[in-house]
A protein has these predicted regions:
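Beta-propeller-forming repeat regions
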Residues: 1-139
Length: 139
C-alpha cells in the first residue's frame, strides 16, 4: 500500500524522471520508483471520501510534446475534459496543465495506437458517440 488516502480511481506507470525506473501516478501524486516512497504533486488536489468517487478516473503516461520526457494524460469524472500535464524535466518543477479533449463521457476510455502510426489515440465516448481523438503531434 502506497497511501491510505483515496486520490484516484486508477493509476498509471511510466518513467517520468528518466532514471530507468517506472514511476506511478495516482491522482495528483507522483510516486517515484523503484521504492515509490519519494512523492511529488502533479497538481493541487485533496483526497476523496472512499465511499464516493474521485475526479481522477484514469491516467496515461506518454511523451505528448516530443521533448523525449513522458507527460501525463488525466481523464477525470465522466463528462469532464481530459487534460494533460507537461513534464517539467526537473523533480521540483511545476507540471503545466493543458486541454487534451473536451467532454470524455465514459468511465473506461483508453489511450492506444489505433491507426498503426506508433502514437496513441484517446478512445472514448463523446456526446453519446464512441470515437477517438488524435493528438496534434505538430504542436
Amino acid at each position: 500500500q502506497l497511501s491510505s488516502r483515496f486520490v484516484a480511481e486508477g493509476a498509471a506507470l511510466g518513467d517520468l524522471d528518466r532514471d530507468g525506473h517506472c514511476d506511478l501516478v495516482a491522482g495528483n501524486v507522483l510516486y517515484r520508483g523503484p521504492a515509490f516512497t519519494d512523492t511529488r504533486r502533479l497538481y493541487d488536489g485533496q483526497p476523496f471520501d472512499p465511499a464516493s468517487y474521485s475526479d481522477h478516473f484514469f491516467a496515461f503516461v506518454h511523451d505528448l510534446d516530443g521533448d523525449t520526457w513522458n507527460d501525463v494524460v488525466v481523464i477525470g469524472f465522466p463528462g469532464q475534459d481530459a487534460v494533460w500535464y507537461r513534464n517539467p524535466r526537473t523533480t521540483d518543477g511545476a507540471w503545466t496543465k493543458h486541454l487534451a479533449f473536451r467532454g470524455v463521457d465514459n468511465e473506461s476510455p483508453t489511450f492506444t495506437d489505433l491507426d498503426g502510426d506508433g502514437r496513441p489515440e484517446l478512445v472514448c465516448m463523446h456526446e453519446d458517440r464512441l470515437g477517438y481523438a488524435k493528438v496534434d503531434w505538430q504542436q
